[in-house]
């Protein structure tokens, strides 16, 4: 049996640009708008100016655009800056079933940076490259049968970057194998930074974008990497997953079905694990408009409860993953804005008062039971919501094109409006029609301030 690296390399090298179905193209266009929104919105997020200062101190000028700025860098630097910004707000796309991997911001950032460095590529070429890259990332992220604390966005997503960027550079199958092997030497990222509320979580996406491009460039120059990348004795899955993965998830339909369509777009700027509860909160608020609950009981799985941060969030990363904060914010105000998560201490006294009345506890019923939330009102009339069904933004419960466009506008406003309203409208048109562009330069030029 050949290593999965051979299968993925053959897929990446040989997939026809005409094999991207319209539903996949349409989803990728929305994913691109969504990713650009997150990048533009994150340009001033904590850690991003500091990263830019460090990188600019030793980076030469280049031809790849750093978005929402006047700066151009070599592709590896622009991709790192854009991908890090795109992950900073925890507002980028996600894979609900694959450990919460956020692949879009880093794959789009890397592919657009390389396209810039190549002088622009045709839209259909770009779409096929990103579709293959995201397909590879999704397949790898879905394969584990047990979680070992990896941040799959970076540790798994780097191989998606290789798939997309390698296609733009025209790698052969053999060169793809080497690129995957070199990427494996750099694949990393953990969730401890999430538990500790560290800014390094956002950096990990940028590292993967940068290192994926570097792996492809080295393979293209003739440098070799491990050939038994994924299934050798010390390969990715034996070492990183202790052999606990399902191979068929990766190989089934490979080359015939693109799984990028399974990626969800996030309607709320916080951890995806909170979104089902926020959907439920929105429904309850509509049903009881104007009523202030005396108490809110949230029942979640024991595993989630063990990881839950229940105290008042002191900073943005903690706020993005705080169940009591998100539920109180949505219930009290009917919104979940970037500004509120960015500065939790500045929220209204109503939110702070309601926060103290949110009680999170482990639910009964085993792993197959649904999370639920109970709103208890004065004088009775409790209202219970179960978080069953796909969360808003999932392909089976999609957000609208209008919602995604509004997200781009909101993110631009949050970042201090680095792009004019007219520029945003033009950017929306270019991104939604990316497959028909004569050159991706027509899109990235709109992101230059």
How would you describe each model-predicted region?
Residues 1-100, 200-210, 217-449:
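Terminal-appendage/accessory-domain detector
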Residues 6, 10, 34, 109, ...:
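Generic structural signal for well-ordered, non-membrane alpha-helices
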Residues 25, 29, 33, 107, ...:
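Hydrophobic face of alpha-helices
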Residues 42, 111-118, 162-169, 215-219, ...:
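Well-ordered alpha-helical scaffold segments within catalytic/enzyme domains
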Residues 83-140:
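Hydrophobic alpha-helical hairpins/lids featuring a short glycine-rich hinge
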Residues 86, 106-108, 113, 135, ...:
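Short connector loops/turns at beta-strand edges and beta->alpha or beta->beta junctions
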Residues 105-113, 156-164, 211, 276-280, ...:
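Short amphipathic alpha-helical face segments that pack within enzyme cores
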Residues 116-213, 228, 233:
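Glycine-rich, mobile lid/loop segments that gate access to catalytic sites or pores
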């Amino acid at each position: 049996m050949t290593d999965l690296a051979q299968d993925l390399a053959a897929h990446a090298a040989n997939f026809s640009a005409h094999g991207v179905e319209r539903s996949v193209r349409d989803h990728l266009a929305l994913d691109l708008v969504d990713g650009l929104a997150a990048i533009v919105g994150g340009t001033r997020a904590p850690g991003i100016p500091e990263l830019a200062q460090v990188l600019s101190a030793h980076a030469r000028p280049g031809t790849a655009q750093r978005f929402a700025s006047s700066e151009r860098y070599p592709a590896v630097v622009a991709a790192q800056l854009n991908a890090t910004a795109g992950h900073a707000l925890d507002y980028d796309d996600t894979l609900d079933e694959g450990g919460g991997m956020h692949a879009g911001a880093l794959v789009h950032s890397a592919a657009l940076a390389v396209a810039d460095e190549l002088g622009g590529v045709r839209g259909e070429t770009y779409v096929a490259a990103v579709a293959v890259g995201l397909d590879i990332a999704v397949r790898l992220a879905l394969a584990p049968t047990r979680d070992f604390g990896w941040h799959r966005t970076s540790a798994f997503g780097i191989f998606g970057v290789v798939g997309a960027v390698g296609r733009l550079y025209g790698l052969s199958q053999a060169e793809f194998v080497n690129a995957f092997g070199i990427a494996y030497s750099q694949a990393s990222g953990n969730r401890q930074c999430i538990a500790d509320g560290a800014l390094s979580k956002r950096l990990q996406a940028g590292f993967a974008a940068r290192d994926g491009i570097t792996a492809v460039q080295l393979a293209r120059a003739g440098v070799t990497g491990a050939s038994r990348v994924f299934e050798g004795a010390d390969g990715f899955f034996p070492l990183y997953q202790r052999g606990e993965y399902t191979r068929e998830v990766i190989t089934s339909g490979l080359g015939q079905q693109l799984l990028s369509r399974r990626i969800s777009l996030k309607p709320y700027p916080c951890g995806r694990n909170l979104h089902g509860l926020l959907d439920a909160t929105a429904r309850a608020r509509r049903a009881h408009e104007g009523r202030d609950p005396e108490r809110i009981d949230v029942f979640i799985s024991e595993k989630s409860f063990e990881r839950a941060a229940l105290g008042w969030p002191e900073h943005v990363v903690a706020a993005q993953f705080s169940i009591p904060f998100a539920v109180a914010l949505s219930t009290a105000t009917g919104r979940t804005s970037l500004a509120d998560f960015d500065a939790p201490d500045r929220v209204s006294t109503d939110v702070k008062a309601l926060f103290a009345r949110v009680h999170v506890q482990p639910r009964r019923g085993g792993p197959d039971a649904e999370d639920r939330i109970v709103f208890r009102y004065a004088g009775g009339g409790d209202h219970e919501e179960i978080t069953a069904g796909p969360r808003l933004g999932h392909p089976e419960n999609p957000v609208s094109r209008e919602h995604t466009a509004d997200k781009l506008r909101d993110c631009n406003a949050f970042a201090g409006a680095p792009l004019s309203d007219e520029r945003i409208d033009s950017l929306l048109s270019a991104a939604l029609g990316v497959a028909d562009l004569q050159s991706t330069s027509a899109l990235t030029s709109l992101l230059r301030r």
